[in-house]
C-alpha cells in the first residue's frame, strides 16, 4: 500500500508451546510408555509373591521348631536313662524362633502394604526412600535368618553325632521326631533367608532403574 512492502511474517513459538510440542502433552504428568508400565507391574507382582512365600516359610520354620519336643529312654553303660528334649532347652533354637517370628511379622506387614497398593493400581515401591528402607530391612533379616540357621545347625549336628571320646551317644536315635522337626525348621529357615536375599536383589534392580 502506497508502494510500501509488507514485512514478512515471523513465526514465533512460545516456550510453553515448544515444550508441549516436544513432550506431546499440554498439561498433567507424562504417561510412561506401556512397556515400562508392564515391567513395573511385573516387578510389583514379583515382590508380592516373594513376600507371601517368605511369610509362609518363616511361619512353617517357627511352627516346626516351637513344636519340637520329645521324651524317650537311652542306654549309657548299660543303664537305661530317661531323656527329654525341647526347643527351649537350647539358646540357638530360641534364637531361631525369635528371628523367624520377626521375619514373619516383617513379611506380613510388607505383604499387606504391597497388596493394598497393588489393588489400588499404585506402585508397590512409591519412592527411592521407600526402596532403600525395604532393602535395608530385607538385608538385615536375611543375615539374621542365616545366623539363626547356622547356629541351630551346629546344635543339631552335635545331637546327631554325639561327642567323640565320650559315652554320649547319638541322641537323635531315641529322639527321632524331635530331630526331624528341628532339621525341617532349619531347612525352611535357610529357604526364608534365600527369599529375603532375592527380594533385596529386586530392590537393588529397582533402585538402579528408577
From Swiss-Prot:
What is the name attached to this protein's record?
CASP-like protein 3A1
| Topology in the lipid bilayer | Multi-pass membrane protein
Q: Which residues lie on this side of the membrane: Cytoplasmic?
A: 1-44, 116-130, 207-210
Q: Which positions are glycosylated? A: 159
Q: Does the keyword Membrane apply?
A: yes
Primary localisation category: membrane
Question: Organism's domain of life?
Answer: Eukaryota
Q: List the disulfide bonds.
A: none
* Entry's localization field: Cell membrane
Pfam families in UniProt: CASP_dom
**Family according to the record:** Belongs to the Casparian strip membrane proteins (CASP) family.
Ordered alphabetically, the record's keywords are: Cell membrane, Glycoprotein, Membrane, Transmembrane, Transmembrane helix
Q: Which proteins does it associate with, and in what oligomeric form?
A: Homodimer and heterodimers.
Q: From what organism does this protein derive?
A: Vitis vinifera (Grape)
Q: Which InterPro entries match?
A: CASP/CASPL, CASP_dom
Q: Which residues lie on this side of the membrane: Extracellular?
A: 66-94, 152-185
Looking at the UniProt entry, the stretches that span the membrane are 45-65, 95-115, 131-151, 186-206
- State the GO CC annotations: plasma membrane
